[in-house]
Amino acid sequence: MSARLEGLDSALRRRWAARVRRLAPWIIPFIASALIAGCASGPREADPSAGLIERMASADVVLLGELHDQPGHHRVRAQWLEALAERRSITIVMEQLDQRRQPQLDAERARLVESETLSARARRVAQAAGFDFEGWNWSFYRPVVELAIDRAIPLRAGNLSREEAMAIARGQAHRLSVKVPSGWGPLQESLLRASITEGHCGLLPDSMIVPMVSAQRARDAQIAEVALSAQASGRLPVVLAGNAHVRRDYGIPLHLSAAAPDLKVLAVGLLEQGQPGNPQAYDAVWSVPPIKRPDPCEALRARFAPRPAGSVGMPAR
């Protein structure tokens, strides 16, 4: 009986061996492909921003700076926003939107238009919130608005209205009831003046710098107020603004600390590699390769150049 079983077992092994030989041309590539796929789906190269994202996720308020014309900054911020939205309930606060038009923003966002694309809807919402399509590059900010709509993320307008900005330019900042933060002093005043002077190539007269200092301080106070409102609702506010606004020494963090000293604020400056600046002004810095851009001072030099005798009107803008 045992011999018969052994003979049967031997016959079965020979039969299966023959089948394997016939199928080998198909089986071996399949196994190889599976092994390769397994390697490809294994651990990827570590994301260099992963640690920074975790720091953002543990904060009470996140401030992300930018150079307005740097596409690399906008790309990485959009990636961070998506990653943060996976970890926390966030609210996006944008410097580019008019805070007084928040009701219009909300109304347009809630209004559905048949067959409207996400891109068209995002543009309609931004327009309702006072986005300046001539002053800002919409292609940089569209992905943020689209993300907010697509993922049902609250979107808050953070900036002063045009009317408020004009009031400040006329020296009427007192009409806005903007409080000077407790940490504001001569050092902060001089740093902000120096930043504005340098940003305008040293061409601005003092008569223009003074209201611009007041305007930026008012903008920072306004954005801080919006961020605090979002944070009080239990969400993580993520503020998108220029680097000067997110600086710890004279920007939004100063206003946040004055209003809520225990708030955990993370200010991230987005710079270009080799860019002169003060990395210590931020809690973290992210640098990207620089882009080529025309001399920004040329237009200002033309604007403030002495006019020929007998000419009338303002220099061309």
Segments and roles (model prediction):
Residues 3, 8-9, 13-37:
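Sec-dependent bacterial lipoprotein signal peptides
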Residues 23, 32, 37-59:
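N- or domain-start disorder-to-order transition segments that initiate the globular core
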Residues 52-86:
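Zymogen propeptides
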Residues 67-70, 97-101, 161-165, 243-247, ...:
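Solvent-exposed loop/turn segments at secondary-structure junctions
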Residues 70-76, 99-108:
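Membrane-embedded segments
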Residues 87, 104-232:
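A substrate-binding/cap region within the structured catalytic cores of diverse enzymes
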Residues 91-96, 267-269:
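Short internal beta-strands
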Residues 231, 245-317:
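C-terminal regions of proteins
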